[in-house]
UniProtKB/Swiss-Prot annotation:
Keywords: Ribonucleoprotein, Ribosomal protein, RNA-binding, rRNA-binding. Coiled coil: none annotated. GO terms for molecular function: rRNA binding; structural constituent of ribosome. This is Small ribosomal subunit protein uS19. It comes from Lysinibacillus sphaericus (strain C3-41). Belongs to the universal ribosomal protein uS19 family. The lineage of its organism: Bacteria, Bacillati, Bacillota, Bacilli, Bacillales. GO terms for biological process: ribosomal small subunit assembly; translation. It holds the Pfam family Ribosomal_S19. PANTHER family: RIBOSOMAL PROTEIN S19P FAMILY MEMBER, SMALL RIBOSOMAL SUBUNIT PROTEIN US19M.
Length: 92
């Protein structure tokens, strides 16, 4: 279920300030954030945002296709190690 259109998209204020400072500066640095709930805006394009996955910050390079999605969608929180191998040989 999506967010109501009358409310508009959500971005944490501290993240938006960091993005505005980054746009004003010449250097491109990685922006660290814990805000997985923030929506990606068009002015984020071309920036690298390190999104926290509960263990480490995952660098996410923002492209045009990502606009409108949440930052947390691009930093998975669970690592899938695969199912166990078939143990028929070891059971004998």
């Amino acid at each position: 279920m999506g967010r109501s259109l009358k409310k508009g998209p959500f971005v944490d204020d501290h993240l938006m300030k960091k993005v505005e400072v980054q746009e004003a500066s010449e250097k491109k640095q990685v922006i660290k954030t814990w805000s997985r709930r923030s929506t990606i805006f068009p002015n984020f394009i071309g920036l690298t945002i390190a999104v926290y996955d509960g263990r480490k910050h995952v660098p996410v390079y923002v492209t045009e296709d990502m606009v409108g999605h949440k930052l947390g969608e691009f930093a998975p929180t669970r690592t899938y190690k695969g199912h166990g191998a078939d143990d028929k040989k070891t059971r004998r």
